[in-house]
Amino acid sequence: MSTICPPPSPAVAKTEIALSGESPLLAATFAYWDNILGPRVRHIWAPKTDQVLLSDGEITFLANHTLNGEILRNAESGAIDVKFFVLSEKGVIIVSLIFDGNWNGDRSTYGLSIILPQTELSFYLPLHRVCVDRLTHIIRKGRIWMHKERQENVQKIVLEGTERMEDQGQSIIPMLTGEVIPVMELLASMRSHSVPEDLDIADTVLNDDDIGDSCHEGFLLNAISSHLQTCGCSVVVGSSAEKVNKIVRTLCLFLTPAERKCSRLCEAESSFKYESGLFVQGLLKDATGSFVLPFRQVMYAPYPTTHIDVDVNTVKQMPPCHEHIYNQRRYMRSELTAFWRATSEEDMAQDTIIYTDESFTPDLNIFQDVLHRDTLVKAFLDQVFHLKPGLSLRSTFLAQFLLILHRKALTLIKYIEDDTQKGKKPFKSLRNLKIDLDLTAEGDLNIIMALAEKIKPGLHSFIFGRPFYTSVQERDVLMTF
């Protein structure tokens, strides 16, 4: 790392985080724009290591760089801008989220950033969406926290009759610390246990001599089918790390190389925490043989999730994309409303808030049995195990199967675009689509729709959204009688 001469500035508060394993992250920073001094760093979070890769002055210099030029920022209220800096001369990349907020009684511009070595660029890019989604929600909560602190401090000053306004917003740092640490832990776990980009089919169930060697045929069929129906997002739990990881690798065969790098294997010694945003992740049960998924993180996942238990061979799935996104948005709104109404820091802790309001009570039983059977995966499994194992035949057959699914998804998108004149008209008939594209089996339609959703986000809501919202509104009206 090249030597940088930091500008004169007061000492910046720093929190060192002890992480298990090697961290790819150099630091996370919270900076703000001072109308007199320009960009200033409020706080630094850095992994605790023996070797200091960046000094505090260098981190401050880099964090200040993210707010340079933001003095003329003219964004809509509530907007969050994502900036991606690649500073080759400094050997770092910076991902910064720029936003406006109230602090010390003034509206100003802030930046929440993470700094990584440039050598980690290929590692980070598949995880970019996960990190941005996490940081975005941190900012949503941070804005509320800053505004509440400002109101409380103004009231305190008025009551005490003081003329000097005290430093406000300081208590936002513990809240940010509690939210930034999980992001750092996620990146550290992905550094050590992410699924490799190039998977060997020999390490998966698809290399068995017969379909029932490693697991029951019906279980494997349900697992792969549901995995594809939920946009390739699955969580695999069990008591044996070896069994869990074998299923994880098997499911990752049906993902793209970039999506595999956004998946995580199970740790043999101790279990990781569930992380929303990963495509496939393996988790160990505790000593009692149980594992509880955190409702909040599951709801925050960008896609619905399949839950697979390798101990009892059960497969359950969340509702489809349009319903998941609908529930997710209502849940987020409910959580932020409860956060706003909280009257103390203890009440504002995420683990103590009851995420309900007058209009929305979340359904805690979000995982359902796999209701819709398919013919695509069943035909694939019937044929692939007839091929001789240990050769490249099965890998080639798998690639052909994935190509067919991709072509079907593209055909479905073009069919809908032509039928609706690229969204200008409402979609006419789902029945005709199923017949014309040979997707009469409900499971087949769900698989192709899920793949099409990843290619063209919002497709689910466009096709199923209006009938779903109408049925929800009708249900809400009936419940008022």
Swiss-Prot record:
Assembly behavior: Component of the C9orf72-SMCR8 complex, at least composed of C9orf72, SMCR8 and WDR41. The complex is formed of two protomers, each individually consisting of one molecule each of C9orf72, SMCR8 and WDR41. The protomers homodimerize via an interaction between C9orf72 (via C-terminus) and SMCR8 (via N-terminus). Within each protomer SMCR8 (via DENN domain) acts as a bridging protein between WDR41 (via C-terminus and N-terminus) and C9orf72 (via C-terminus). The C9orf72-SMCR8 complex associates with the ULK1/ATG1 kinase complex.
Protein name from the UniProt record: Guanine nucleotide exchange factor C9orf72 homolog
GO cellular component: Atg1/ULK1 kinase complex; autophagosome; axonal growth cone; cytoplasm; cytoplasmic stress granule; cytosol; dendrite; endosome
InterPro entries named among the record's database cross-references: C9orf72
Domain dDENN C9ORF72-type: 370-464
UniProtKB keywords: Autophagy, Cell projection, Cytoplasm, Cytoplasmic vesicle, Endosome, Guanine-nucleotide releasing factor, Lysosome, Nucleus, Secreted
PROSITE patterns: DENN_C9ORF72 (PS51835)
Domain cDENN C9ORF72-type positions: 200-343
Biological role: Acts as a guanine-nucleotide releasing factor (GEF) for Rab GTPases by promoting the conversion of inactive RAB-GDP to the active form RAB-GTP. Acts as a GEF for RAB39A which enables HOPS-mediated autophagosome-lysosome membrane tethering and fusion in mammalian autophagy. Component of the C9orf72-SMCR8 complex where both subunits display GEF activity and that regulates autophagy. As part of the C9orf72-SMCR8-WDR41 (CSW) complex, functions as GEF for RAB8A and RAB39B, thereby promoting autophagosome maturation.
GO molecular function annotation: GTPase activator activity; guanyl-nucleotide exchange factor activity; small GTPase binding
Limits of the uDENN C9ORF72-type domain: 23-194
Subcellular location: Nucleus; Cytoplasm; Cytoplasm, P-body; Cytoplasm, Stress granule
GO BP field: autophagosome-lysosome fusion; autophagy; axon extension; endocytosis; late endosome to lysosome transport; positive regulation of macroautophagy; regulation of actin filament organization; regulation of autophagosome assembly
